[in-house]
Every structure is written in C-alpha cells, then in structure tokens.
C-alpha cells in the first residue's frame, strides 16, 4: 500500500557573497590628515591637499588642479552632491571649503559613473559633517588671516542634528596701517580685502539606513581700494 504523509514546511535559503569592487581610481583622503599638511598662513586648504595626490598636477599659486591632461573646468566638484562652479577665493589663493565643516573628501580620477556627467577629468566629492546628535559642541579658532567658528548639536537627540560653521578673513584690518603709511601724505586709502564662508546643515535620521538632510553654503569675496 502507498501512504502519503504531510510534513512541515522546508525552507531553503542561500546568501550571495558580497563582492567588494575595488575602484583603483578612487582616493579617499581623511580630513584629519588634510589638517596636518602645512598650509599657507596656517589656513587649511582641501584643494591644495588634493594637488599633492599622485596623478594630479597644479599651477603655482592657484586652487585649480589638472587630472589626466584636462583643465580645471573638467573637474566636477560636488559639495553634498551639489556642483560648485567657483571653488576659490581671492583669485585662487584659498579654496571655498572650510575644513572644520567637512566630513569626507573623495577624488575619482577616471572611470566614474555616468551620473557624474559633463566632465572629462575627475570628480571631487566633499561631504559636510552631519552635526553632533548627542550633545552641543562649539569651537572658535583665531588664525593669522582668519577666524572660524563651529557650532553643532542635537535638535532631537539621536534623531535630528545641526551644524553651523563660518570663517572670515581680516586681511583688510591687518594691511590697513601699511597701506595708509604708503599712501600720499594728506590722503587716506581704505583697503577692502576679505572673504567669508558660511556652511549650515540639518540632518534627520529616518531609520538606520535612511536619512534626509538640508545643507546650505554662502560665501563672498570683497576687493576694493
């Protein structure tokens, strides 16, 4: 006799191996390492640090860089995914990126995905910090040519955070006595030479793998006599 039996459910599961594809043209530069590089007048400059990487050429005294024979305009520079078309202050002496507000720096020198279109040489991705989600923290720095401040903290603890960071140079204040001393007796010359940057970001964690953020940047150069 043939009898049938009902058995419990049998589940067969398999897991695919995660293959990590190494992209040889991608270089990630730790921001803490960038801060240890000697800088002009003590002003940490991310673009100047990029110019020191292998496969990258630069011109003396400018913040532009050349990759694979292309000009500076063939480098796509992104700040939190948004293109930055003018990445320098005062004619290229300093870059517009405040290192105190930056979380990560990645340079892709070739073979970058199609979503980074419109450029031939490289893609420079700069991501801002997300802010401290546990406690408030503030920093204030006085340098040779500029002062900087950073304020970050939670809006909703462990959920929503913010960061505000800014800097302003005071080259005009330092140089004013020397300019007036060199001017014609009986006349005064007002030197206007400074720039400022302001970065702000609000980050909200939706889940462990998802988040939404709003980031903003503004800056200005002022030059006049």
What residue ranges belong to the model's regions?
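Structural signature of outer-membrane beta-barrel domains
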Residues: 17-19, 72, 84, 129, ...
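Outer-envelope beta-barrel architecture signal
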Residues: 73-75, 101, 134-138, 158-162, ...
């Amino acid at each position: 006799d043939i009898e049938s039996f009902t058995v419990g459910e049998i589940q067969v599961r398999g897991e695919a191996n995660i293959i990590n594809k190494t992209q040889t043209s991608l270089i990630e530069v730790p921001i803490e390492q960038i801060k240890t590089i000697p800088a002009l007048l003590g002003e940490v400059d991310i673009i100047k640090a990029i110019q020191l990487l292998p496969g990258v050429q630069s011109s003396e005294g400018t913040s532009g860089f050349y990759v694979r024979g292309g000009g500076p305009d063939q480098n796509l520079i992104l700040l939190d995914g948004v293109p930055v078309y003018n990445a320098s202050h005062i004619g290229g002496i300093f870059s517009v990126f405040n290192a105190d507000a930056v979380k990560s720096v990645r340079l892709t020198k070739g073979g970058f995905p199609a979503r980074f279109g419109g450029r031939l040489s490289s893609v420079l991705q700069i991501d801002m910090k997300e802010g401290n989600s546990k406690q408030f923290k503030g920093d204030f720095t006085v340098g040779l040519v500029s002062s900087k401040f950073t304020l970050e903290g939670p809006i909703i603890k462990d959920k929503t955070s913010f960061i505000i960071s800014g800097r302003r140079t005071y080259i005009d204040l330092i140089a004013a006595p020397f300019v007036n001393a060199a001017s014609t007796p009986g006349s005064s010359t007002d030197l206007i030479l400074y720039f400022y940057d302001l970065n702000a970001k609000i980050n909200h964690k939706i889940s462990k793998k998802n988040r939404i953020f709003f980031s903003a940047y503004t800056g200005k150069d002022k030059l006049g006599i």
